[in-house]
A protein has these predicted regions:
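Active-site neighborhood of glycoside hydrolase catalytic domains
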Residues: 1-55, 61-64
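Short beta-strand segments enriched in hydrophobic/aromatic residues
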Residues: 113, 273, 285-287, 360-362
Length: 401
């Protein structure tokens, strides 16, 4: 390896293993150094003292930088788990290792694309992991420093419009979309504007494990609902993709501070169109991780949670899934489960206001079919080819133009 790769560093691992020989890791570090290379190792992993290793890579939330040992932060940076619209918010707004700038102890950052599951080609690898948008977000943060808190601070939800965090992300989004149009034309770049997309989302109603149970929002929209003697509030959210509960649970804050299993939420908005037009729609209720063996949805269903969506009172049905296997295997590639690798669902927007309504149940947060359930939704109108957002639309749950 040292002879083949003309690089200054060699990574020797040391994570997720039970150490039985206390001399093995120091011996391997010395051996690699004898070949003229510097050595990187995982943290958590082997416990080093300054001088015993040249750099550590922090791979989980338990990873901690040590004074005297340069560290690279890759905690929460696993693109193979990222969705299209939520995780990039946390990625851009977060400080690297929660520090304003680099130092002798904080060397930089790494984004990981760890597809344990078979990938058919490079284009799908880049598309499903939203590679270019996330790289641009991380590159700006790495070069310029700064940011706001960390992944476990504000999380994956866009903050209020008048906050510095929102203004910074909206500015970045504007510049990123310019790069998409002028620099990345022809490349798989799965992102459209989302800072203009507004929703109202209810508090979650307890469904007792019945994912089909109906609740008051299915009868009428209101600012507060009453069910079984208690009020259920409604709160506004922004974004084309909203995590109600993140894939890593409460480690990364999402819409609900303390989400619970066996609950049902509702999200809705009005969308103003200046004309009647056929458009595409990205719709997704379980963004499939690229390192999981999760099973594809059953025919005619969006997911295993019972998620449903209506446009102007007409239910929007899922596409025909290209994967229908019932055997879990990392050697079976994903089909068209994720919205960015399939043609958008074609729908018609009427001139004027259009009603979008979603029912979002959840049962267990880990099931036989899906190990890491993402309680979430993605819904945004795009051109029929999925290349751009539809121009001239206004997303407003209060019908404000």
């Amino acid at each position: 390896v040292c002879e083949t790769f003309e690089v200054p560093y060699i990574h020797i691992g040391t994570d997720e293993v039970a150490f039985t020989n206390p001399e093995f890791v120091p011996e391997m570090v010395a051996y690699v150094r004898s070949k003229g290379k510097k050595v990187i190792s995982w943290n958590p992993g082997w416990r080093y003292q300054p001088g015993e290793i040249d750099m550590t890579q922090l791979w989980s939330f338990r990873g901690k930088a040590q004074p005297g040992i340069p560290a690279v932060d890759s905690r929460f940076h696993y693109l193979n788990h990222f969705d299209t619209f939520g995780d990039i918010v946390a990625l851009y707004n977060s400080r690297i290792y929660n520090q304003e700038s680099g130092s002798e102890d904080i060397a930089g950052v790494i984004l990981a694309v760890w597809n344990d599951r078979l990938v058919p080609d490079e284009k799908e690898l880049i598309s499903e992991n939203h590679f270019y948008p996330n790289m641009l977000a991380m590159a700006e943060r790495a070069w310029r420093g700064g940011g706001f808190q960390y992944f476990d601070g504000h999380g994956v939800i866009l903050p209020e419009e008048d906050t510095p965090e929102f203004k910074a992300f909206a500015d970045f989004e504007e510049r990123m979309l310019w790069l998409k149009k002028h620099i990345f034309q022809g490349y798989p770049f799965a992102y459209v504007r989302q800072t203009n997309v507004k929703w109202k989302i209810t508090e979650a109603f307890p469904n007792g494990g019945d994912l089909t149970r109906s609740f008051p929002p299915e009868q009428e929209w209101a600012d507060v609902y009453y069910y079984e003697g208690r009020p259920y509030q409604v709160k506004e959210a922004r974004g084309a993709g909203i995590y109600l509960r993140h894939v890593w649970g409460t480690l990364v804050p999402a819409f609900y501070p303390q989400p619970k299993e066996n609950h049902t939420a509702y999200a809705y908005t009005w969308v103003y169109s200046p004309k009647t037009q056929e458009v595409g729609m990205w719709i997704e209720f379980q963004n499939y991780g690229r390192s999981e063996m999760d099973l594809p949805p059953l025919a005619g269903k969006w997911d295993y949670k019972g998620s449903r969506i209506w446009l102007n009172e007409q239910e929007v049905l899922p596409p025909q899934w290209t994967a229908n296997h019932r055997e879990k295997s990392n050697e079976i590639a994903l089909g068209n489960e994720n919205c960015v690798v399939r043609r958008p669902v074609l729908v018609v927007l009427q001139k004027g206001w259009n009603k979008v309504f979603m029912k979002l149940p959840v049962g267990r947060f880990s099931t036989d079919e899906v190990r890491l359930v993402k309680w979430m939704f993605t819904a945004v109108f795009v051109t029929p080819d999925g290349g751009e957002a539809v121009e001239g639309l206004i997303y407003s749950p209060d019908k404000i133009r």
